[in-house]
Amino acid sequence: LELDIKWAIAGRNPSKLENVARNFSTNVEILVADADDEKGLKDICSRSKVVLSTAGPFHRYGSKLVAICIENDTHYVDITGENFWVKGLIEKHHKEAARRGIRIIPSCGFDSIPSDIGTFFAVRSLNKPVKRVDSFHSWKGEASGGTIETMFSMGDLNLGKDIRDPFLLNPEGSYTNEQKKLSSDVFKISKQKDLNAWSGPFVMAGANTRVVRRSEALLTERQESYGNNFTYQEYAFHKSWSKALLSTLGLGLLGLTLVSPLRKTVRSFLRKPGEGPSLEVQENGWFDCKYLV
């Protein structure tokens, strides 16, 4: 890194951390702690201004770290897509973090930076109030073992109906009946004439839409609303109806697998936490987002 920043890498396995550190030309300090090691986590947080966490599933490994960050006035950033867990963080820590001036910023990976920041800049580029933003996503890549574990682990949790709430992460009283009526999750295939393409359900929409709606609600509290009764929706982008159909069927099959008795059997054949796509797959991966405002 060319920036004048003192940084370190942390994890539970010193030898693996040393292998990672060899990839950097600068001296990188190595810090060792497990997600359940309160003493080790306190040592890391007490010495850090910001902690960036990539260790999921976060509902298993992230809660103690967030609490210790706040205790030590340390900002926290992660890549979770687990909105039910983020909801718990908001309920437990939002007021105290705000009082201390500490930033707790979940969902800073593929979910949900493109959606959240893309919507922000799309709206701001018009320099006027906006009623609605629709985003359309296409991508190429493979999931890591941690992401796969997160998806399959949710079947063991009693999440209830709240997980389907389009405004799960919003502050209480921050949305209207009109907004709620126009914000239901999308499961159908539709022709998008403005794009000369087709849209269908997007695998990350359930996570991303909640984050975008919360961001807009928090901006509204600062008198920086996107627009009166603003709504946001998200779709997968497809060039043809047949591709939209195949993708939607695949997504439906995945959903059925995650709630079926066979999920543990299927899980055993897939990547484990700590495993990921090959370097070739990573280097050839991409995503594209289009915004209709």
What are these model-derived regions, one by one?
Residues E96, R100-K140:
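Adenosine-phosphate binding glycine-rich loop
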Residues R124-V293:
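C-terminal catalytic/substrate-binding lobe primarily of soluble NAD(P)-dependent oxidoreductases
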